Amino acid sequence: MTLLFDIYPAIGHLNASFALANQWREREHRVVYCAVEAEHKKIIETKGFECIMLDYPLESDKQELRVKGLRFIGECFSSVFTQKRKHAFFREIADWENRITSLSPDRVYLDAQCALRTALYHKLGIPVVLVETMPLSLYDPWVPPFTSGLIPKQTSISRLGIRLAWEKIVIVRKIRNLFFSMLLCRQDYFSLYKRLFLECGFPFEEKIDWRRPFIIGIKESKILSMNPSSLDFPRKYPPNCQYAPSRVDLMREDPMLNQRYARVMEEVCLQKQQRPDIKIIYCFSSTVMGFEKRSKIIFMTIRDICLRNPQFVFILSVGKYHNTSYLLPCPSNL
């Protein structure tokens, strides 16, 4: 059986997928990755997997505006008459389709942050499993969206806040899509993908799930969450969703390779002794490079959450290139 891994181009997402890919390889299945960056292709091949290079069919509107500015708006305006942008998009899609067809995959593990490509695989008749490499993004009335900064409590006020947080995502996303559609004369990312859905015979209005904290999702899709359920807030077991098992032996007694965690574990044990009922929330942020402004916003948000919830203890693990001075003055419960 040939399995295609179409993973979002970020190191953290790739690393999360390797655990699953290794299991399939051990069962003597063929595993093939597709990559858009040469650096990622090198990492994948170092792990012993096949990899093909595939360009993005379309860059995001924000990225195009960041690089081209007003020139991009002009290109979109002229494309209303020439259809240049639409034709270029569908040429990329045709190339993508030919490359995928040549592989003849029996199943695709598609990163949930690339969910709009589900339509293409639907057209080719290839079953898709969406891989969530971050906390599960499915709507649950008792679990806040990951990006909200809310901590669920068993109260009516908490449930109302959670509901409003989910509705805010839908409203903001629709307003943003409408804004880009008008600004870019319906030559925007979302409008072109909507046309792809129609071309592929994939019902757009019925399948699009607006209630997702990171990016638009696809309803009724099979989902594999690479985060064990124990690392998420308690929630109802979602249909068509499977949690990956924990890949860490919590009872192991091997020497700690990174001694910076020793101090953290000592502090956690001390807190548990002093307050046995204490709740500990673990937060993590992977390596950030070239997103200093965004990193600052995230750190300030985490700091505010800690200050609003003194009854919890927070552990924050960060990757490279983070400026942790944004947390100063550091809350006592962080």
What are these regions (language model features)?
Residues 1-14, 37:
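Nucleotide-activated donor-dependent transferases that construct or modify glycoconjugates
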Residues 191-244, 250:
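Long, low-complexity segments enriched in small/aliphatic residues
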Residues 233-327:
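Conserved catalytic-core segment of nucleotide-activated headgroup transferases in glycan assembly
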Residues 33-78:
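Conserved nucleotide-sugar phosphate-binding/catalytic loop shared by glycosyltransferases and other
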Residues 65-118, 122, 168-215:
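Conserved nucleotide-sugar donor-binding subdomain of glycosyltransferases
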Residues 14-24, 39-40:
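Short amphipathic alpha-helix
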Residues 332-334:
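Active-site donor-binding acidic/aromatic loop of nucleotide-activated sugar
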Residues 86-166, 225, 229-232:
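Conserved nucleotide-sugar donor-interacting segment of glycosyltransferase catalytic cores
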